[in-house]
Amino acid sequence: MNRLILLFMSLFLILTSCANREDIPDSIFWINGTHAVLTKVNNADINRFGTMAPSNTNRTRVLNTLDNSWDITTREDLDYMIDTLVVGRHNPFFLEQAIAYGITSMTRSEFELEIRAVQERELVMFFRNMFEAYEAFGERAILGWDLSRATQLCAFGYIAEFYTYDEAVDKALAIGKVIQSQFNSWDDFYSSYFYGYAYWSEDDLENPRSEYSRRVSIFNNLKADSKSPLNLNWNLELIR
């Protein structure tokens, strides 16, 4: 029995072993930073492109995730989803709603006056998140949420074997340059990301035990970690 346990533990360590930071260049480590919060949520490896080692087991795991969470079953599906995220998948719907609710034309004082009439706590959080996202970023309101998932899908595409390593890295670096052009810093980018996550998840933003609060805590821990990609220069040249 003890031998079986040791064998299982050895196999587990092989499948889940973490890469060393030195194994990847700064540019790819920077890309890992763009989806680092979700990588940590998934208990995956922030030091490895793909967030896990290539293996049959991990390929099956990622294929199931892509199918169940994204309805992606082919390379063509993946290409389409990434392209859609890069130009904005949830962001356009967010803007449509913000316009419909009159959010985009309100000053802060006007918003604060209007929100007093809203009784439901969940709606107050929803509208406040929407107003603050638009006030901070305008038409890029939650684009960070879309772009973060685009780079992650590039990494998953590699593990799923829809892309070669070179194809996935080239796609991710191209998206990284878009991210740099749209946002000014890691804080800037992740502010948009969290506005988007709040919009998509409809989570309780005031509950310290909510998934939203957990992700914010992960982000703050990453910023405090000197070995985190979030401490790389935001304007790092993204080349191979």
Language-model regions: role of each:
Residues 2-9:
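Sec-dependent signal peptide recognition
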Residues 15-17:
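C-terminal motif of bacterial Sec signal peptides marking the signal peptidase cleavage site
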Residues 19-165, 169-240:
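Polar/charged low-complexity regulatory segments
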